[in-house]
Each structure stands twice: as C-alpha cells, then as structure tokens.
Amino acid sequence: MPSRVTVLSLLVEELRQGNIQVVDLTQPLGPDTPVIDLPPIFAASPGLSIETISHYDEKGPAWYWNTIHLGEHTGTHFDAPVHWITGKDLPNNTTDRIPVGRFVGPACVIDCSKEAGLYEDFLLTPDHVLAWEGEHGKIQPGSWLLFRTDWSKRQGREAFL
C-alpha cells in the first residue's frame, strides 16, 4: 500500500532535509533561573526547586525521576490573555482553549541585540518595526514578531534582572 502524502508528511520531510528551520527558544531551567521580583505587598512567584524521588536506589532501583516545583512564570513561558485583567473576559483566553495552530507560524526577527547591549533599558518602538518592514517587507497576519536582545546570554538572576 503506497504511503499517503499529507501536509504533515511534507513538513516532516522538509524538516529532515533542512529546508525548514524550527528554532527552540526555551532556556534551560535551574536554581539560578531568573524569577520576577514583585513589591513585597504582592504574592511572590517561587523559583525552581527540584526534589529527587528516586535515583536508581531503594526508592526506585531502575529509574531516576524528580518532583519539580516552580511558579508558572518561571523560565520560558507564554502568558495567556487571562493572565492580565484586560484578558479575563475574552473568549478562548486560557492556554487550553487557544487553538494550537495559533502557536505556530513564520517568524520575523527584529535584532536589537547591539542596542540592548548598550542600553539595559532599551525599548522596541513602532519605528523599529516600521524600519524592519521597510527592509524586509510587511509583517504578515499570523506571523510571530520576535525581538532579539541577546539577554538569553545573561546568566543568573543578577545579570538577567
């Protein structure tokens, strides 16, 4: 029986041949992963803690696993609209209700790493977006706009925050 060609099989083939690039933007989690510090009057988000359940020992002789405890805003994450008061009444405002297809799309990268390296409080403005579009073309609906700062190279809480 011949295999059926589907959009998914074509995507997989293009990925395997290196014609499409998927970029993993996640950062490793660890004890030094930065966590936002809020004023003391607000509840704090915990950092990452890992507790070993078993490590090939009497608690589990053939496996290694852990309990991981962290706030939902620790490390690389997505804020659903419901996270902010402005999104609490929107339809499909939680991660389980947002169609998965909305999380995948072509990306446009505005590289301001030099500026962010020179000015820690550098802000992306509409003028940066318009300049990028002037050089690369209009950002299409459904595209992701990524703002490159190279802050991912900063290690530890002090350097990042």
Predicted regions located by residue number:
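Active-/binding-site microenvironments in catalytic and ligand-binding cores
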Residues: 1-161
